[in-house]
Curated annotation (Swiss-Prot):
Annotated knockout phenotype: No obvious effect on unicellular growth but induces a premature development arrest, with an inability to differentiate spores and to build a true stalk indicative of a major defect in differentiation and morphogenesis. The abortive structure contains a mixture of undifferentiated cells and vacuolated stalk-like cells. Differing results include abnormal development only at very low extracellular Ca(2+) conditions (below 10 nM) or at alkaline pH (pH 9).
Keywords in alphabetical order: Coiled coil, Cytoplasm, Cytoplasmic vesicle, Endosome, Membrane
Protein's organism: Dictyostelium discoideum (Social amoeba)
Any one GO biological process: protein transport to vacuole involved in ubiquitin-dependent protein catabolic process via the multivesicular body sorting pathway
Gene that specifies this protein: alxA
A family per Pfam: ALIX_LYPXL_bnd
The name this protein goes by in its record: ALG-2 interacting protein X
Region (Disordered): 695-794
Length: 794
């Protein structure tokens, strides 16, 4: 088997050109951050350059370097007039060197060497057993795919044709010889598997044709003077060999259908071909090839002589001339395999120009808009279908026909019974009340601290008059009082929502309780007698409803596919390519969503027809329903609603519990902020009072505040310390402007409280301290609402 020699190269340094480009186009910080990646790139190229072994490890190393070059090609304009990096490479045939300032030339050369290593692995594989033949075949087909991809790539970058092995004829010849040898492996495996002579004949005929084509390409003007002469010899020998094998196998099949004259004619041609194969064998030909040719010379010659003798003495069948024989059908099974996926950690993935990021963001907006539109369409049609069924009393009216408790209701009852429905909701309500009380207590404690501090400050100011010259509390606590008012408001809303949930539970408590008693429900359900002649209508209606369920389930599956596609859809690398207009890229890439969109549109149209068919069948069905059936249906609907409310209550209470737990963390932090502030103010109060009573002038520049006055809360992030006593009023005013504590909003929960007052047992809303004058929230702040007690859809 033939393999391809690798191209050779010299050492190349990426460091200076790439570092300079990154620094100029991005920043020095970016260039510093990529020093390691560039050094690794240099090292990887050296490893690839010095490869000697033909192993899977070598193959993977070359592929890794080729993959990284794909990133360089997109991000660095490596050319003679821009980022100047010269790449010297010899051609595979004569080892003549070409040097180009082209990343395309470098990438094409590395891909060539990848194909070369693959071909060498294939040709060196032991094919004495089936597994070896299969491995060699797979590698030859992969090599064909590599050289085919290289032919396409080189055609897009004409500068690559500087190297003789990158000409169109050269690369086509390499694809052909790889396919020829892969087809040869397929023939060998078929022979090992003892397949029919007819199949073997067709496979061998295709091998011969591939070698003929390869020979013709080698004799083209651009290749005949530079390729190894042994390639022509091998191609000629194998072309004759497999023509002979094809004729030989076909002739054996003719004996089975008593076409003895044609059999002799084909065997005579086979003898000529196998002799030509032997004549063209070079002395340097591999021993394995010589043995194969010699073996077939003997087999075909003997079989031909035996067939001629039998025909002359027994059959006397006319031997047709060669030109009247029908050509043997060829069976090409070898095919060029696609290249492996480029799957690597891109060392330069952060080097994306801002303009490309904007273009990528624009496309992301397009796909997100498309996704939202389709998801909204799915939701609309699903809800529309459910509403249509509900308006027709379905599926309740069908379930009402079951004897005893319908399966769907039994399942609901089992859920409620296993969860101890009423007890479960009662426990959750008690738990949420406890959490609400705890949150309220924390918030009230914080408010009391602030009020107490302000009252004491006002008392000191009234007692000492002008001597009590420090910043008033209300000035420093503006943000704290604002947060207190905001948190108090949230607790008020939350208690209203809790009240609504409790009332909802009380309204449906009995029905939920009954769901835990199957015997009682069975006793309540009247029997439903339907004329036997209407069983067909029921069956038809059930089938249509099942079809509708399947349709909606399929839409949900399509929705998931859309989400996954949208999540993985990143076209940044494609936008980096200068070869294509971005508007064309947008148009092409968004098309990948069209098949799923078409499936959805077909589903929506099908739903319209299904709903109409269900409506017609339901009209036939409802005309025959009995009075008992209607009563039964009403009872079943009642318990279906009770189960729905039970699930809503669980969801509301779980969400409320999470809200109170998260809110408690925020309130505790707020309480600590208030404690820090009031502690610092208390220390200041004590020291200032001591100085006044000692007769020390607090404004004297000689007076140094005690350590306790050194901003006792400065170590905390909000810095609620007041100004020092020895500062002037102007200095105090400047310091006051720094005391702007940052607000910490509560967690993000959707909440829509009901418009009525909570009962007294919930503790009622917490009023802010009377002396506070909480300012309204700043315009940039939008307080997130707490949880919504009625925001679930079932």
């Amino acid at each position: 088997m033939l393999s391809i020699e690798r191209k050779r190269t010299e050492k190349v340094d990426f460091s200076k050109p790439l570092t300079k480009y990154i620094k100029e186009q991005f920043s020095k910080a970016e260039s510093d951050q990529h020093e390691t990646q560039i050094a690794t790139l240099n090292g990887l190229r050296e490893d690839v350059r010095n490869l000697q072994e033909r192993t899977e490890t070598s193959k993977e190393m070359v592929w890794k370097y080729y993959s990284i070059l794909s990133s360089l090609e997109l991000r660095f304009p490596i050319s003679e007039n821009n980022v100047r990096i010269s790449f010297p490479w010899t051609d595979s045939y004569r080892q003549r060197k070409s040097t180009l300032y082209s990343i395309y030339f470098e990438r094409a050369s590395v891909l060539f060497n990848y194909g070369s290593i693959v071909s060498q692995i294939a040709s060196s594989t032991n094919r004495s057993n089936i597994e070896g033949v299969k491995k060699a075949c797979n590698q030859f087909q992969l090599a064909a795919g590599v050289f085919n991809k290289l032919r396409e790539y080189a055609s897009l970058h004409p500068e690559c044709s500087t190297s003789a092995d990158f000409s169109s004829e050269s690369l086509q010849a390499l694809v052909t010889i790889m396919l020829a040898q892969a087809q040869e492996c397929i023939y060998e495996k078929a022979s090992m598997d003892n397949l029919s002579d007819s199949i073997l004949s067709k496979l061998a005929a295709q091998v011969a044709e591939y070698y003929d084509t390869f020979n013709q390409l080698l004799n083209s003007n651009s290749l005949k003077s530079i390729v190894d002469r042994n390639w022509n010899i091998t191609a000629t020998v194998k072309s004759y060999l497999y023509k002979a094998i094809s004729l030989y196998c076909h002739a054996k099949g003719l004996e089975q259908v008593s076409q003895f004259g044609e059999q002799v004619s084909r065997l005579m041609i086979a003898v000529d071909n196998i002799n030509q194969s032997k004549v063209n064998l070079a002395k340097t030909a591999p021993i394995e090839l010589k043995e194969i040719v010699e073996r077939y010379v003997i087999s075909i010659t003997r079989y031909c002589e035996s067939a001629k003798k039998d025909n002359d003495t027994i059959y006397h069948d006319t031997i047709p001339p060669a030109h009247k024989l029908t050509p043997i059908e060829k069976k090409p099974l070898a095919k060029a395999l696609p290249l492996p996926e480029i799957n690597f950690v891109d060392p330069f993935n952060s080097l994306v120009p801002f303009s490309v990021k904007e273009d990528s963001a624009y496309y992301n907006d397009q796909k997100e808009t498309l996704l939202r539109k389709e998801l909204d369409n799915i939701e609309f049609h699903n809800q529309s279908a459910k509403a249509s069924l509900l308006s027709m009393g379905l599926p309740g009216s069908i379930e009402a026909l079951d004897v005893g408790v319908p399966v769907a209701l039994k399942e609901k009852m089992n859920v409620v019974t296993n969860e101890q429905g009423v007890s479960n909701i009662t426990r959750l309500l008690e738990n949420i009340q406890q959490l609400s009380d705890e949150d309220s207590a924390i918030c009230l404690s914080a408010g009391n601290l602030l009020k107490k501090e302000e009252d004491e400050d006002n008392l000191m100011r009234a007692t000492y008059g002008a001597q009590w010259h420090r910043t008033p509390s209300y000035t420093l606590t503006a943000n704290l009082t604002q947060d207190y008012a905001k948190y108090t408001s949230h607790l008020q809303h939350s208690t209203k929502s809790d009240s609504f949930i409790r009332k909802k539970f009380e309204d449906h408590k009995n029905s939920i309780q009954e769901l835990e008693n199957q015997t009682e429900i069975i006793a309540l359900l009247p029997t439903n007698n339907l004329p036997s002649g209407k069983i067909a209508e029921i069956a038809s209606l059930t089938v249509l409803m099942n079809d509708l369920d399947a349709l909606m389930a399929n839409r949900e599956s399509i929705a998931e596919k859309l989400k996954n596609l949208c999540k993985k859809d990143d076209i940044t690398l494609k936008l980096l390519s200068p070869q294509k207009d971005k508007s064309l890229i947008y148009a092409e890439e968004i098309q990948k969503y069209e098949p799923l969109q078409m499936s959805l549109n077909e589903s929506f149209l099908k739903q319209q027809k299904l709903i109409e068919d269900i409506r017609k069948e339901n009209e036939k069905f409802t005309n025959q329903k009995s009075k008992q059936g209607n009563q039964r249906e009403e009872i079943l609907q009642k318990y279906a609603n009770a189960y729905k409310v039970y699930n809503e209550l669980k969801a509301n209470l779980d969400e409320g519990t999470q809200f109170y737990l998260n809110f408690q963390e925020i309130l505790n932090k707020f309480l600590n902020r208030c404690k820090d502030f009031t502690t610092g103010r208390e220390n200041e109060k004590i020291e200032l009072k001591r100085q006044i009573e000692a007769g020390v002038n607090p404004h004297s520049p000689l007076t140094s505040p005690s350590p306790s006055l050194q901003s006792p809360v400065n170590n905390y992030p909000n810095q609620f310390s007041s100004p020092q006593y020895h500062t002037s009023p102007n200095q105090q005013q400047q310091q006051q402007q720094q005391y702007v504590p940052s607000s910490q909003p509560p967690p993000q929960y959707s909440y829509n409280p009901q418009p009525y007052q909570p009962p007294q047992q919930f503790g009622g809303p917490l009023p802010p301290p009377q002396s506070f004058s909480a300012p309204p929230p700043p315009q940039s702040f939008t307080a997130p609402p707490p949880y919504n007690s009625n925001n679930k859809h079932y």
